[in-house]
UniProtKB/Swiss-Prot annotation:
Chain positions recorded as substrate binding sites: 113, 163, 167, 285, 317, 369
Name the record gives this protein: Ribulose bisphosphate carboxylase large chain
EC number(s) reported in the record: 4.1.1.39
Sequence positions bearing N6,N6,N6-trimethyllysine: 4
Free-text comment on the cofactor: Binds 1 Mg(2+) ion per subunit.
Length: 436
């Protein structure tokens, strides 16, 4: 009796097709492309092993713990229809592998090490099922959809936004002027672009002050609550929180964070600050396409969206289906419902691999942004629904008469589309006629 050293095939330990998943397991759906000559069972088991308790060889200390309790298990494999040498590999992870309330730890475990594994030609994480027992360890969005509507006193329609352009180079005063013109023209929000932080041409404190002035002036003249997504993203968490504190002192309703470049730890810290201090939190997904664009490698955005809902954010950019940035309608709507709804049934046609119960975690408002303009309004109103932000940057500031007329055009088009929808008219068929 004793320790038997040596290398074992992963599938002998980690491929368990007889395993019945538990309600407390985190479930993952991986698209696996094995190297030539590697059986799919071995590839799937390798993913389960390397993202949980395994390493490349048997180790003496395996005998000091219970692998049956802690190991990840590849419990099902199926070929991907229409794709040669690609397989969906389903892995179950025991909940005890993960720190409570930490998206950072969850991702470090599940995707931190396996993507460079030499037995795999490519690997993509398509979806995660997060069990209620784990969700209950997260605060989630600072406020959620209903609380945001109540704070802003805006009901029965999507809200309208605009990213200030040019994104870089404006002085703080000219930037604030553009914010005022857009809000005065009828928009609900304006927005810092994702790479506007605190550069030599416009330091963050100056921008915050001039934008706050624009917000209060526009509110006084319109009688509506307005906001500007003040980007608090910074080089350190301490600096980020300092900017959030200043925004709160100015009395503005909403700030912003780039959650992928800033990181999940920073984002969760900021979300907690926002809930404690009554600030809404807008999330930009800068860098997402580096991670999710390839069809056979990386992480699908629906996983990043779920992670954001856990980490915390009241808005997140979600694609448009129309416009300049890539998005497929059914797939985009799939992760939109994962952001907004409380209980989502499995639906492979929309890319939803698992039934997800959010157990009343607040919802996130999807933001449609990127190359959209006033003629897209009927489609956006129909596709996105009321609980959304429709964000027109060039589609507002590019109006031939200027910023304020561009904002007026967007607001009038939205009001017309909402009224037509409420009257029972078909936006898909009559869209252009409605806003002419």
């Amino acid at each position: 009796v004793g320790f038997k050293a040596g290398v074992r095939e992963y599938k002998l330990t980690y491929y368990t097709p007889e395993y019945e998943t538990k309600d407390t397991d985190i479930l993952a759906a991986f698209r696996v492309t094995p190297q030539p000559g590697v059986p799919p069972e071995e590839a799937g088991a390798a993913v389960a092993a390397e993202s949980s308790t395994g390493t490349w060889t048997t180790v003496w200390t395996d005998g000091l713990t219970s692998l049956d309790r802690y190991k990840g298990r590849c419990y099902h494999i199926e070929p991907v229809p229409g794709e040669a040498d690609q397989y969906m590999s389903y892995v179950a992870y025991p909940l005890d592998l993960f720190e409570e309330g930490s998206v950072t730890n969850m991702f470090t475990s599940i995707v931190g090490n396996v993507f460079g594994f030499k037995a795999l030609r490519a690997l993509r994480l398509e979806d995660l099922r997060i069990p209620p027992a784990y969700i209950k360890t997260f605060q989630g969005p600072p406020h959620g959809i209903q609380v945001e509507r109540d704070k802003l006193n805006k009901y029965g329609r999507p809200t309208l936004g605009c990213t200030i352009k040019p994104k870089l180079g404006l002085s703080a005063k000219n930037y604030g002027r553009a914010v005022y013109e857009c809000l005065r023209g009828g928009l609900d929000f304006t927005k810092d672009d994702e790479n506007v932080n605190s550069q030599p041409f416009m330091r963050w404190r100056d921008r915050f002050l001039f934008c706050a002035e624009a917000i209060y002036k526009a509110q006084a003249e319109t009688g509506e609550i307005k906001g500007h997504y003040l980007n608090a993203t910074a080089g350190t968490c301490e600096e980020m929180i300092k900017r959030a504190v200043f925004a709160r002192e100015l009395g503005v309703p909403i700030i912003m964070h780039d959650y992928l470049t800033g990181g999940f730890t920073a984002n969760t810290s900021l979300a907690h600050y926002c809930r404690d201090n009554g600030l809404l939190l807008h999330i930009h997904r800068a860098m997402h396409a580096v991670i999710d664009r390839q069809k056979n490698h990386g992480i699908h955005f629906r996983v990043l969206a779920k992670a954001l809902r856990m980490s915390g954010g009241d808005h997140i950019h979600s694609g448009t289906v129309v416009g300049k940035l890539e998005g497929e309608r059914d797939i985009t709507l799939g992760f939109v419902v994962l952001l907004r709804d409380d209980y989502i049934e499995k639906d492979r046609s929309r890319g939803i691999y698992f039934t997800q119960d959010w157990v009343s975690l607040p919802g996130v408002i999807p933001v449609a942004s990127g190359g959209i303009h006033v003629w897209h309004m009927p489609a956006l109103t129909e596709i996105s629904g009321d609980d959304s932000v429709l964000q027109f940057g060039g589609g507002t500031l590019g109006h031939p008469w200027g910023n304020a007329p561009g904002a007026v055009a967007n607001r009038v088009a939205l009001e017309a589309c909402v009224q037509a929808r409420n009257e029972g008219r078909d936006l898909a068929r009559e869209g252009n006629a409605i806003i002419c």
